[in-house]
C-alpha cells in the first residue's frame, strides 16, 4: 500500500481529515449490553432491540458520540462550553503582569531595588535573611583559602 494512502486513512478523523465531517462527543456513563447468541427476529426494530437487550450490572465513564445535533446541544447547555482563551497558559493575564512590574528593578540584575515599597522583597532583605556573602565561606572575594593547603601538608605520625 502507498504510504500516502496509509497516512490519509490514519488521519480521517484527525486534523488533516475532512473538515466538513463534524462530530460531537460527550463524556458520560455507559452501561454495555450483553451479547446474546440468539438470532433476533428480523421484524424487530433497532430501538426495540436496544430496549430488550440485557445490560451488564456495571457502568463506566467514556466518550460517547452524540446522536443529537451539535447546535441543539450548544443552545441547551451553555454552562458546559468553556472559552479556551481564558485558560490559555501562554497568555499572561493583566493582573499577573501588573504585580510583577509594580516596583522598579535594577537594570543590570533585574532584582528589585532597595527603595521599593509595599510587598516586594529588596535585595538587602534577601541578603539579610540568608546572610551576607561574607557569612558564607568561600563566597567572599577577600578570604584567602590558604588554611586548607596547610592542613593537607601536615603529616600524621
Curated annotation (Swiss-Prot):
Q: Name one GO biological process term.
A: chromosome segregation
Q: Which UniProt keywords apply?
A: Nucleus, Phosphoprotein, Transcription, Transcription regulation
Q: Which intervals carry biased composition (Basic and acidic residues)?
A: 147-157
Q: GO terms for molecular function, please?
A: DNA translocase activity
Which Gene Ontology cellular component terms are annotated?
Answer: chromatin; nucleus; RSC-type complex; SWI/SNF complex
Q: Where is the protein localized?
A: Nucleus
Question: Could you tell me the superkingdom of the organism this chain comes from?
Answer: Eukaryota
Which Gene3D superfamilies does the entry mention? 6.20.420.10
Chain positions found as Phosphoserine? 77, 122
Region entry Disordered: which residue ranges? 95-157
Q: Where is the composition biased (Polar residues)?
A: 96-116
As a miscellaneous remark, the entry gives: Present with 1550 molecules/cell in log phase SD medium.
Q: What is this protein called?
A: Regulator of Ty1 transposition protein 102
This protein's species is Saccharomyces cerevisiae (strain ATCC 204508 / S288c)
Q: What is the lineage of its organism?
A: Eukaryota, Fungi, Dikarya, Ascomycota, Saccharomycotina
Amino acid at each position: 500500500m502507498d504510504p500516502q494512502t496509509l497516512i490519509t486513512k490514519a488521519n480521517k478523523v484527525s486534523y488533516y481529515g475532512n473538515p466538513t465531517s463534524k462530530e460531537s462527543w460527550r463524556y458520560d456513563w455507559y452501561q454495555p449490553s450483553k451479547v446474546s447468541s440468539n438470532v433476533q427476529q428480523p421484524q424487530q426494530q433497532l430501538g426495540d432491540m436496544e430496549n430488550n437487550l440485557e445490560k451488564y450490572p456495571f457502568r463506566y465513564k467514556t466518550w460517547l458520540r452524540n446522536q443529537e445535533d451539535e447546535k441543539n446541544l450548544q443552545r441547551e447547555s451553555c454552562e458546559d462550553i468553556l472559552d479556551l482563551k481564558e485558560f490559555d497558559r501562554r497568555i499572561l493575564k493583566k493582573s499577573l503582569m501588573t504585580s510583577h512590574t509594580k516596583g522598579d528593578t535594577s537594570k543590570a540584575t533585574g532584582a528589585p531595588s532597595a527603595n521599593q515599597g509595599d510587598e516586594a522583597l529588596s535585595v538587602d532583605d534577601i541578603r539579610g535573611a540568608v546572610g551576607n556573602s561574607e557569612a558564607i565561606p568561600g563566597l567572599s572575594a577577600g578570604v584567602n583559602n590558604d588554611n586548607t593547603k596547610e592542613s593537607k601538608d601536615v603529616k600524621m605520625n
